[in-house]
Amino acid sequence: MLHAVSVLTASLFLPVLAGEGFRWRLDVADEICRPDVPEADSMGGITWVSNNVYWAVTDEKHKTVVWELDIPVDAATGKVNACRMRLLCRPEGTDDIEGIARDPLDGSMWLVDERAHAISRFDPVSGRRLPGRVELPAVMGRFRRDFGMESLTISSDGLSMWTCSEEALTPDGPLSTRRRGSDVRLARFVRGAAAEPWKPAGQWVYQTDPIAGKPWHNKKNEDMTRSGISELCLLDDGTLLTLEREFSVMLVPRFRCRIYETDFSQATDVLDLKALADGPAFSRVSKKLLHEATGFAMYEGMCLGPKLADGSRILMLVSDGDKKSLRNVLALRLSLR
């Protein structure tokens, strides 16, 4: 049972909450390099449209571009046959877009602007900003610079949305260290129809992994080491997957990416807490590791893709592809245990 959940929140949340325990597995299907296209570095998010078509967002030098990706896969094996890209639109009035989700109710797109601390709706053809509102709780505005919202996922029925900050909000504790992870609030929003605003419907505490490697300093001798959440993905049964990424040094600077399945069955709803340290005791979300990769691909975007012939689903990931990382596309096979 969830603890400290209001009657309204519980009625909105429980019907789409996955059952207690862990039930999913991931297997690598294929990994390829996407095209080297101008303005296509710093890819931060991806969302599935239909069949082989995805939308992905890049934010190179704070110039946001949404791309249409054509990624056909073999229906039997999940092998990626190609990755083709074309410019879809340039969303107006954006600054630091890190996440994208297609709205299944009307086909529009929602974008996360980390620096502006906003989730806004756009026309995917013209890039024009559209009416639409996400009522972010005040506590979510207390994020650290460059550690704000990067993730976004919407349920297949279009009535539930999830996001979170990359690492802990300032009143909730420190950033991740080599000894301890960072406490992040997984935030859920709901609406009754496409025209209605998204309203808060719960927050649950998730602890990221501690940093496994040694500090990574840039040319200015700034410590770039971090371990936080770069993406969320909501499955049809209500299960929430998290994508954690780490920058650190083992023998050389490298990226460590992990995908976790979550279990909320014993977690406490902390929506009404202004600071985790000041409130009553709470229970965190449980998690189970499904996939881990270490190397030079910095995976930041993740979404569900089409079904394969055996009923499993593709989980598609894209790497940032900036000067420090590869421009990779990773297809994983998601199936029940």
Per-region residue spans from a language model:
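Bacterial N-terminal signal peptides
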Residues: H3-P15
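Sequence/structural signature of beta-propeller domains
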Residues: V16-R337
